[in-house]
């Protein structure tokens, strides 16, 4: 993997994490956003980059590494965006979508919050590396099925003109 590909992966992961983090305080949507951040962020970023021709997965090793990078970066940006929004909402309008989590964000020391975010980031990297691995096999399965359905073109040797 070259630096350009890794930079694209990180940028799109940051964008996805911030979007998920900003939408997470909405009631009933927050749980779905957390599930997307924990499990589905690697397939989303990988499929987008593959369709945009910015990423080419050649081995399972690259898919696992890509999934781990996506998972960790999405979790860090998700956590920063979510903690910032919840701190602002809790201080200004006394809103809390999850009382225990909001209390922890507001009252805990920064180092403890950082350790918690990194711990969850490693968990998110692990689950997303597995989902990236599964995505690699699903993409290859679809490619193989597509190639089998296409008729094999014979060379133009079989083509003859009749008068």
PLM features per residue range, with description:
Residues 1-163:
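Juxtamembrane/disordered regions of integral membrane proteins
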